[in-house]
């Protein structure tokens, strides 16, 4: 099992087309901000393309602390192999504990490939995201002066809970990947 203490931060794969960010990017960055606040870490956008550095600053207004920009003429338009390689290389180098990818056509192509290459889980069509902090509830009740952003927790307890519809939408399933980040 990996040392989860190496993993830090919530990342969002930011999708652009013809040099413009997609609306899902802003939604995901806002959701990432909530998760990062709970984890006490930063939100990082990952933006791939060609001549896209100028649009990266737009993500800050939605909660991104920083944006990593990977520019190349080869990344101007989405291609599965190129984008999967760059995303996986960046994740392996920087080790975010959460990576969010939108449920767009590109996201549905890229997400499973990255999950397989990174040997981690993937939940498609999640409708709710949360951090499993159950072990800390009693601790927090005992002390109302605790600033969560300054606390160090056992990383194995910081699981992302992903909720999605199951069985034709008649049931909601909550999924965690406790052995992977």
Regions found by a protein language model. Give the residues of each.
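N-terminal glycine-rich FAD/FM-binding segment characteristic of electron-transfer flavoproteins
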Residues: 1-181
């Amino acid at each position: 099992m990996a040392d989860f203490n190496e993993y830090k931060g919530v990342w969002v794969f930011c999708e652009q087309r013809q040099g413009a960010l997609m609306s899902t990017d802003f939604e995901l960055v806002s959701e990432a901000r909530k998760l990062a606040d709970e984890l006490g870490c930063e939100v990082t956008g990952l933006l791939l393309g060609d001549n896209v550095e100028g649009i990266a600053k737009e993500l800050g207004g939605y909660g991104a602390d920083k944006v990593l920009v990977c520019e190349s003429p080869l990344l101007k338009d989405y291609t599965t192999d190129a984008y999967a390689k760059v995303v996986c290389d960046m994740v392996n180098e920087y080790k975010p504990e959460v990576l969010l990818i939108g449920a767009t056509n590109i996201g549905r192509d890229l997400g499973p490939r990255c999950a397989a290459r990174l040997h981690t889980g993937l939940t498609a069509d999640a409708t709710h995201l949360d951090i499993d902090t159950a072990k800390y509830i009693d601790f927090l009740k005992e002390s109302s002066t605790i600033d969560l952003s300054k606390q160090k927790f056992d990383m194995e307890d910081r699981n992302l809970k992903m909720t999605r519809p199951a069985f034709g939408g008649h049931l909601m399933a909550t999924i965690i990947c406790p052995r992977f980040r």
